[in-house]
C-alpha cells in the first residue's frame, strides 16, 4: 500500500505510553493495526476502539514530545518483522529493526507478530531426550526435544547463568538455529550474551531480539512475540529451532503496566485480568508441529520466592519440565541451585527415559526426602541419636547434594575452575554408585564441584 493511500488520524490524548487517536468514523483501524506517527519512526499499536472514530493505542517507543493534534497514519496491518536467515547474527528491537549498527536487514520475508497457534492435528509431541550436560537437570528433570522448559527462581539465585550454560551446552552442540528474546532484562546481560555468542563462533546461527528494562511497556510486552515469530518461521521451514526467553515474568509485568494504562480493573495481586489469556496465546504458539520443532527454555522470575504468585503459577501449566532454583540451596554454596525435590519433568516415566534412569532418579529423591525429614531431629538432638540406617541415608544424601553441584563453562571467569559437561550415561553411573553404597568410604567434600564420579575419586585421593 502506498503512503499516499494511508488513512490519517489525529492524536487527541496522551497518557504516558497510551495514546488516543481520532480517525474518520468510516475508516477506524482494526485491533492490533500498526499506526505510524507522521514524519517519525514511532509506531503505535491499536488496543481498543473507543467509538466515535477514536482508538486507544499503546506506544512502541518513547512518547516524549508527543502532543495533541499530531498526524498519525494507519498502515492497515499488524506489526510485521523480518524473518528468515538474514536475521541471524543480528540484534533487533521489537519492530525487527537492527540495533547493532551493522546495516539494514535485507529480508525478503516479513511476518505479522500476531499469529494463530498451530491447529491441534498439526502438533507433533516428542519424547526424545535432549541432553544438557548438567547433571541435576539430566537426572531429575530431563528435557524433551521440542519441549518447553521453565527456569523458576527468585532474584539472584542463578536463572540467567543457568540459561547461559544451557545455551552454551545445547546451542553450540545443536548445530541448528536459535532465537534469543531478551524481555525486560538488564541491557548489560544482553551485551554480555552477544559477545559470548560472538566469541564462541555461533553468532551466525542466533537471532537476537531485545526489549530491555529501560524500554516502554509496549516494547517489553511485544518483544517476546517478535522473537517467537522469527522462531516460528524457521520451524515452518522444517527446521528444529531453539527459543530462549529471558524473562517471561517481565512479559507479564509489561502486560500489567499496559493493562493499568488502558484502564482495566486489576485482578489478584494487581495483575491484569487477561493474564491467563495473554500467557496462553504466547505459550500455545511455542510448540512443535509435523514440519519442525521449537524447543524453548524460559527463565521465570518468582516474586518474593513465592511460587504461588499468579504469574509463575500461570506459567507452570504450560511447561513440560520445570527447573526450580532454591535460595536455600544457593545459600549452601551449591550451584546450580536446582531443588531436586521441587523440580519436575513429564519425561520422568520408565517408558520414556528407561527403567534404570527412572529408578535412580526416584532413589536419589527418596534419599534426599529422608534427609529433609531428619533435618529437624539432627538440629535438636544431633546425629548421634539417629539409627544406623538413618545415619547412612544422611551421609549419602549429603554426598548426593554435593554431587548435584557442577562447575559451569560460563562461570569460569568468576570461579576460576574449568566448566564440566557430563554425559547422561556418566550422570546415571555416578548417582547409581552413590545410592548403591559404592562411595560410602569417600569424604563428602570430594563430591563438591566435580564433573563425573571418577573426578570425585581423584579428589578424595588428594584430600586424604
Curated annotation (Swiss-Prot):
Signal peptide feature range: none
Bilayer topology: Peripheral membrane protein
Reaction catalysed by this enzyme: ATP + H2O + 4 H(+)(in) = ADP + phosphate + 5 H(+)(out)
Residues reported in the UniProt entry to bind ATP: 153-160
Matching PROSITE patterns: ATPASE_ALPHA_BETA
Keywords tagged on the record: ATP synthesis, ATP-binding, Cell inner membrane, Cell membrane, CF(1), Hydrogen ion transport, Ion transport, Membrane, Nucleotide-binding, Translocase, Transport
Domain of life: Bacteria
Location(s) in or outside the cell: Cell inner membrane
Principal location listed in the UniProt entry: membrane
EC annotation from Swiss-Prot or TrEMBL: 7.1.2.2
Alphabetical list of SMART domains matching this protein: AAA (SM00382)
Gene Ontology CC annotation, any one: proton-transporting ATP synthase complex
GO molecular function annotation: ATP binding; ATP hydrolysis activity; proton-transporting ATP synthase activity, rotational mechanism
UniProt similarity note: Belongs to the ATPase alpha/beta chains family.
Assembly behavior: F-type ATPases have 2 components, CF(1) - the catalytic core - and CF(0) - the membrane proton channel. CF(1) has five subunits: alpha(3), beta(3), gamma(1), delta(1), epsilon(1). CF(0) has three main subunits: a(1), b(2) and c(9-12). The alpha and beta chains form an alternating ring which encloses part of the gamma chain. CF(1) is attached to CF(0) by a central stalk formed by the gamma and epsilon chains, while a peripheral stalk is formed by the delta and b chains.
NCBIfam families in alphabetical order: atpD (TIGR01039)
Record's function text: Produces ATP from ADP in the presence of a proton gradient across the membrane. The catalytic sites are hosted primarily by the beta subunits.
PANTHER family according to UniProt: ATP SYNTHASE, ATP SYNTHASE SUBUNIT BETA, MITOCHONDRIAL
Designated name of the protein: ATP synthase subunit beta
